[in-house]
């Protein structure tokens, strides 16, 4: 029996921050890769220059690269005051990529969306993929990303093309010239003692190679829909998922079986095994002898409950019949094609703890840097007033303000997401924790700017 043919990859936006990390991961495993972008920054893979909104230019790159899988990461950076550019790249450009893919018989399209497509300025707590984008987006960037995502999902099944969209949150890491650049500027201006909000809001940051890893998993598992037996379904949704513990380490859970946490008065049966599994750093090995795997208990409100899965499948079938041959084809929440997935580090942290970890690392290598000063905290309402004044002044002098109401809101709300679907369906597990990720990013930044390690 012959092995399945390997995909040939074209990375749209392959010279960019995320795109480059995807290229490096593909090269590391021996795949054939080309890139399409407006600027060539690397010379280790074939490069095709062009405008993403021009379908003929994208199509030529697809033909020359012989791509069977396109990973579309291209986008203007968040935070620029140019709605027309966002629409041109994220909507018109995405449609051009879809058209070129269908015209040239590409099998797979993986689209980099954003967790921000469901953000409307309110708290997002353990949000899963059932939440639709709001009627009014927070800004032009997320509005255009939501529309691009909609186009990609609607194209699933068109001309044999299978599609999937990933929604990463707060990407950071080596090569980032947005998050790290902004935090470095605050550090250089000695403004690290200012805080807006009470810092009780959890936020999802995601290390860049984890996001790249998720894209490869999505591409690998983007295959035609098949019927899942009850056993296959159970294998996906009922196995034990340990908590992500790359930064915090494994923690002993005070379950009824673990009590009392102190010395036993009368040791229960299997006392030694119980103690051993709570001290075992391998979460899977903790359940080798007693009640393995632990039961997965779901309510009807759970995103992967039987009721929710059945409802999704029924609606997908109805939608497919209405669209007939034009697409989209039926989808299944336990398979990749036609789906969206939140991608995070699985380690939501208090918002201001992340920048302070970066500043702390910068301060260690900068002996001349002033010591950390007493913290000055502004309530959210005050921050919004100051941001409004900054926006007004920026408009008056024709300069883009660095301090905006969006950024104030961004820093004061809960924004963290449920990645169970990605872990179960994609097989995604973060590879690099937040603490290690911050270290790698700061080490890269220091090397780039000639700072002491």
What kind of region is each of these model predictions?
Residues 2-29:
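N-terminal Rossmann NAD(P)H-binding glycine-rich loop of SDR-like oxidoreductase domains
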Residues 50-92, 96, 100, 117-120:
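NAD(P)H-binding glycine-rich loop region in Rossmannoid oxidoreductase-like domains
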Residues 96-141, 164:
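Conserved Rossmann-fold NAD(P)-dependent oxidoreductase catalytic core, especially the SDR/UDP-sugar
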Residues 119, 140, 160-182, 201:
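Flexible, glycine-rich beta-alpha linker
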Residues 136-164, 216:
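Active-site Tyr-X1-5-Lys
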Residues 166, 211, 215, 343, ...:
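Non-catalytic, hydrophobic alpha-helical segments
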Residues 221-401:
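Mid/C-terminal beta-alpha module of Rossmann-like enzyme folds, strongest
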Residues 359-362, 417-425, 429-453:
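Amphipathic terminal alpha-helices
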